[in-house]
Amino acid sequence: LGQTDPDRRSNWAHTRDILLTADRLGYHNILLPTSFVVGQEPIAFASAIAPMTKNINLLVALRTGEYHPPMLARALSTLDHLLEGRLTVNIINSELPGYKESPELRYQRCGETIDFLKLAWSQPDRIEFEGEHYGRISLPADPAKPYQQNGGPLLYFGGISPDSKEVCAKYCDVFLMWPEPEESLYATMQDVSTRALKYGRTLDFGLRIHVVVRETAEEARAWARRMMSRFDADKGAALKNRTQDAQSLGVKRQDEFRESANDEGYLEEILWTDIGRARSGCGAALVGSPEQVLRQLRRYMDMGIRAFVLSGYPLKEECEHFARLVLPHLPNVRLSDVQGRRPAVPPVTPLTT
């Protein structure tokens, strides 16, 4: 970690191969992150790769404010049709690249964007919207009708601030968390669930976490040590700080938990935090044997977590390890199918006729 490898750049060929590997191995959803600095622009990338996929859902991250809501609704509906209902959306509420914006502006814009999407995807005839940020919008609903029904693509959302939790509780479908001790995760879930009840809603919960799994715990820990063997703190900090969310409350909280870990970086038995020293965002990994990792994932499921966004280093190889050692022993379904979003037959919309 903390080193650059030209063979693993986030270019089209490498990211395409990772995604198609996950599709072939039976994963049902994959995150396409958004960043101005690294990686592929997620909506463009998803549109290009959609015809190559067979079964996997695409969890497309988008930062609210980058698209005008009517065209965003139409772009996502078009992508949902390309994927035949295999689109999910991760709403991001960070500052726009190059700007410093007040939290009040961001949350107002974010809430109105989500509100418009849900309105556009549920109205039979017209979209009549009124907001403080975007003003009045009046449009026919047909051009933005998605492939999925009963509310359109699932909306994922994360964040630890009270405003983040409130936005998710009011509008979204899945509250996505980063790794924390179990008691902290459970407290967050209780808080968000209580907030959702005020709006007569219930939510699903997801966990974004890295994984290092090998045939034995000793091999997994050895790989974790190898990952840090060439770590340079200055390079790691530079890589971490170039990202849009490097100074967010969530990233700072991940850093705080790492300070509480033991000398080898473990916060809990197999929850390893050193991986967060060289990257922003999700800052911990499950490191262990298949039995250990499976046991911990089942503990999370017993808490009420039903969606997992997993990753590792290198991405393609860790995807293969997990698919061979752990995935066959987990319940593996599409959350959008569980929630009745994908129709049994293609819907009749302007994008299908």
Mark where each language-model region is.
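An alpha-helical appendage that flanks or caps ligand/catalytic pockets
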Residues: 103-151, 180-301, 331-353
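Alpha-helix-loop-beta-strand connector modules within alpha/beta enzyme cores
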Residues: 40-60, 120, 199, 322-338
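Short, acidic/polar
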Residues: 8-21, 75, 158-167, 289-300
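Glycine-rich, proline-tolerant flexible connector loops at the mouths of alpha/beta enzymes
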Residues: 29-49, 179-183, 311-323
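N-terminal beta1-alpha1-beta2 module of alpha/beta enzyme domains
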Residues: 1-53, 57, 148-153
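Hydrophobic faces of well-ordered beta-strands that scaffold small-molecule active sites
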Residues: 30-32, 57-62, 87-91, 155-158, ...
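Conserved, mostly hydrophobic/aromatic
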Residues: 22, 26, 49, 79, ...
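Active-site mouth loops of central-metabolism enzymes
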Residues: 1-13, 61-70, 149-160, 211-214, ...
